A protein has these predicted regions:
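Conserved S-adenosyl-L-methionine
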Residues: 145-242
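Long, ordered, amphipathic alpha-helical scaffolds
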Residues: 217-276
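Class I S-adenosyl-L-methionine
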Residues: 2-190
Length: 276
C-alpha cells in the first residue's frame, strides 16, 4: 500500500486494541494485571499498578489536547457534530459500537493517520473533560463543568486514607454523576471495584474511552469472575455479577462493559502491524 492511499477502518472494528495493549504494557501494565486476575479469579497481593495522573493544565506541551483538537477541527469542515462522531470513531476502534460512524473516507483516513493514542500514556490525565467542557459549557441543557483534578485528588485521598490496602482493592466506589470519569481515574490507584452514572451519553462514552486506556477492570469484566462477591468477612465488597456491560441507556446509566476480548485474541491482533 502506498503512503498516499486511503486507510479505512470501516471494516476494522477493534483495530485500536492491539496498540492499546502494547502501550499499556510499555507504561503501566494494567491490562496484564487484569488478565492475571481473570486467569486466577483472585486479586494479587501488593499495590495496584499506579498511574501518576495530573491535571491537564500541568502538562506544558499539552500534546493530547492539541492532537484531539486537530482531529475534531478537521471533522468540522464537513460535520456539524464532529466531536460526537470522533468519539464514536474511537469507540469503534476499541471494539464498541453497533455500526461504523457516518464519516467520509477522507475523514476516516485523516483521523487514522493523525490520532495518537500513545500521547495519553505520556500525559496521563482526564483529557476528555477539557474537550467536553469547551463543547458543552454553553447552549447545552446538559452543560458540563468538570470537578478540578486537584479537588478530585484530595477527595480520593481523603476517602481511602487510613484503610488497609488489600481491603481497599475490593471496596466499592460509585460516582452518580461521573462525567468523563475523572473520579474513576484517581480511585483506580486504590480500588478495582468502580462504577458510575451520568445523564449524558456523550460523557459516558468519554468515560468508557478513559476506562479502556487507564482502567481496564472498568472496561472489561467477564462473566464468572467472583472477586467482588459478598462474603460474611468482607462487607465492603458488593456483588457485581449482574453488571457485565458498560453501556449507556437513555437515563445515562453506566455499567461495566463486556466486549469479546481475551488475552489470546489480543495476542493475535497484536501481530498485525497496520491497517491495509
Amino acid at each position: 500500500m502506498k503512503d498516499d492511499d486511503i486507510r479505512s477502518t470501516r471494516n476494522k472494528k477493534g483495530w485500536l486494541l492491539p496498540y492499546l495493549i502494547r502501550l499499556d504494557g510499555m507504561f503501566f501494565g494494567r491490562w496484564e494485571y487484569l488478565f492475571k486476575i481473570i486467569e486466577e479469579d483472585r486479586i494479587p497481593k501488593g499495590p495496584i499498578p499506579q498511574i501518576p495522573f495530573k491535571a491537564v493544565e500541568e502538562y506544558t506541551e499539552r500534546l493530547v489536547q492539541k492532537n484531539i483538537k486537530k482531529c475534531i477541527d478537521r471533522g468540522y469542515r464537513e460535520l456539524s457534530s464532529s466531536l460526537g462522531l470522533f468519539i464514536d470513531w474511537i469507540m469503534w476502534g476499541l471494539g464498541r459500537g453497533e455500526e461504523f460512524p457516518r464519516v467520509s473516507e477522507e475523514i476516516d483516513d485523516f483521523w487514522y493517520r493523525t490520532f495518537n493514542l500513545g500521547l495519553f500514556y505520556k500525559e496521563p490525565a482526564d483529557h476528555w473533560s477539557m474537550i467536553a467542557m469547551e463543547s458543552m459549557s454553553t447552549g447545552n441543557g446538559h452543560g458540563f463543568f468538570p470537578t478540578p483534578a486537584s479537588v478530585v485528588k484530595m477527595m480520593t485521598e481523603m476517602t481511602f486514607a487510613g484503610g488497609f490496602q488489600e481491603n481497599q482493592k475490593r471496596a466499592s466506589m460509585m460516582d452518580p454523576c461521573c462525567g468523563t470519569g475523572i473520579m474513576f481515574l484517581y480511585a483506580s490507584n486504590h480500588t478495582l471495584n468502580i462504577q458510575g452514572n451520568d445523564i449524558s451519553p456523550l460523557l459516558v462514552k468519554m468515560a468508557k474511552i478513559n476506562a479502556f486506556i487507564y482502567i481496564p477492570w472498568l472496561a472489561y469484566r467477564p462473566k464468572g469472575l467472583t472477586i467482588f462477591d459478598k462474603t460474611e468477612d468482607d462487607l465492603q465488597s458488593i456483588d457485581l455479577k449482574t453488571q457485565h456491560s458498560l453501556v449507556s441507556d437513555r437515563s445515562g446509566g453506566v455499567s461495566v462493559s463486556e466486549p469479546h476480548i481475551s488475552k489470546e485474541l489480543l495476542t493475535e491482533l497484536s501481530k498485525k502491524e497496520k491497517i491495509k
